[in-house]
């Protein structure tokens, strides 16, 4: 069973989605799978999808879940601040940015760029590694999917309400680790 939200920029109402919409959709999917199978669910997700899994599990208080497995989904966002910017400064700036994101989201190209800026040295090393191996097709082929993804294939836009809420709750205030994030008006830990 797979929950795929599609590319918000291509889905009707996709750019108006909130973080709560995504978390409740995952929770609803758990209920539907349990109804079909009669069994509890192993919930898994990658990147932001994994964070939705964490959030849905907390929202449900793990009811109906056997396990949660995530890949590339930080529970602690404090180590993600790039360029050595102090976390308290970054938190205040991101809070201000989130307050002003209510009118516009983040296009897919900006999502890709933002990801690369989280670790600019790693991005640069990856680029240099690729260029130095251009002569060796066999060395490049196993990583082609990853290269295409990091170059921009597969990135989607962030809806403004979901992005603002994510930045405010999980980046500026690190609520995934600290607890106390809000889903559908309910405080969740």
Residue positions per predicted region:
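Conserved alpha/beta-hydrolase
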Residues: 1-10
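Short His-Asn-centered micro-motif
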Residues: 3-4, 45-46, 71
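Catalytic nucleophile-loop/oxyanion-hole region of alpha/beta-hydrolase
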Residues: 9-40
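A generic local structural motif
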Residues: 27-31, 54-55, 182-188
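Generic structural signal for hydrophobic core residues of well-folded globular domains
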Residues: 33, 56, 170-174
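Alpha/beta-hydrolase-fold enzymes
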Residues: 39, 52-161
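Gly/Ala-rich beta-loop-alpha elbow adjacent to hydrolase catalytic centers
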Residues: 44-53
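Conserved serine/cysteine hydrolase catalytic core
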Residues: 155-189
């Amino acid at each position: 069973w797979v929950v795929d939200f599609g590319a918000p920029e291509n889905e009707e109402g996709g750019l108006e989605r909130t973080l709560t919409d995504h978390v409740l959709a995952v929770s609803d999917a758990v209920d539907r799978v349990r109804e079909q199978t009669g069994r509890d669910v192993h919930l898994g997700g990658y990147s932001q999808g994994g964070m939705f899994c964490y959030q849905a599990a907390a929202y449900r208080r793990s009811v109906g879940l056997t396990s949660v497995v995530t890949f590339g989904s930080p529970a602690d966002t404090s180590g993600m601040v790039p360029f050595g910017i102090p976390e308290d400064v970054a938190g205040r700036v991101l809070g201000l940015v989130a307050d002003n994101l209510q009118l516009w989201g983040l296009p897919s190209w900006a999502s890709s760029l933002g990801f690369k800026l989280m670790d600019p040295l790693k991005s640069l090393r990856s680029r240099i590694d690729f260029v130095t191996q251009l002569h060796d097709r066999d060395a490049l082929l196993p990583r082609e999917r990853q290269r295409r993804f990091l170059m921009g294939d597969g990135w989607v836009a962030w809806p403004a309400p979901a992005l603002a809420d994510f930045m405010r709750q999980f980046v500026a205030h690190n609520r995934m680790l600290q607890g106390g994030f809000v889903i559908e008006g309910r405080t969740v830990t």
